[in-house]
Design a protein with these regions (language model features):
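PRPP-associated nucleotide enzymes
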Residues: 1-216
């Protein structure tokens, strides 16, 4: 798997990451969601470089022209609920893409162990298509893998490109091992620590709660 980490190079993306991590800016949930969307634009742009293109003839008001346009059938897939703002940002770039949604979540058992469950899986036929799998936080990588395995019920994609905002080093290593070799991970930042509760450190906290409020 090819891994691309965007904040290794300076760009305005790093300013959005700083706001996402900042405990004071996080108090504005609308701004937090918007910053996730903005990061999605960058991830989608980088993903577009891995796609196939074909020549398209277009007519301008003055003459004819040719442009290379995406020829792959693209499906934007997200892991609910935290994945929605990222999904929206990616969809703003790939605005003709199909859409898929999976609910993958973790349950903490009384003994401290984690259990991951899938309860919702809605997708078009994925056979031979390029799937952009969106989840803002790549912690252990288990929910990402479960989402991918659930989506395989709808056909085998030609390629999977994972798009994430922040991940742990352990999570990156996990998906690198478990996903097909022609997959790609494009991620804005990778943090060094995954704590005993499987939270990314320094991370940014619970992305779903910061987007949509706490849950019982």
């Amino acid at each position: 798997m090819e891994v691309q980490i965007l904040n290794y190079n300076n760009s305005i993306l790093n300013s959005f990451l700083a706001e996402l991590r900042d405990v004071n800016v996080q108090k504005d949930s609308m701004r937090f969601r918007k910053n996730i969307e903005r990061v999605g634009w960058f991830l989608a742009y980088e993903a577009s470089k891995s796609l196939n293109y074909q020549v398209q003839n277009v007519t301008t008001p003055l003459s004819d022209s040719q442009e290379n346009t995406v020829s792959d059938a693209v499906v934007v897939a997200s892991v609910l609920r935290a994945g929605m703002p990222l999904h929206n940002g990616v969809l703003e770039v790939f605005d003709t893409a199909e859409n898929a949604f999976v609910s993958a979540y973790r349950i903490e058992n009384p003994d401290g162990s984690l259990e991951f469950k899938i309860e919702y899986n809605a997708a078009p036929n994925l056979e031979g298509k390029t799937v952009l799998l969106c989840d803002p936080m790549l912690a252990t990588g288990n929910s990402m893998l479960l989402a991918y395995q659930a989506l395989l019920k709808h056909g085998t994609p030609k390629q999977v490109i994972i798009l994430s905002v922040i991940g742990s080093k352990k999570g990156v290593e996990f998906v690198n091992e478990k996903f097909p070799s022609n997959s790609k991970l494009i991620i804005a930042a990778v943090d060094p620590i995954l704590d005993e509760k499987s939270y990314i450190v320094p991370g940014l906290g619970d992305a779903g709660d910061l987007c949509y409020g706490s849950k019982e």
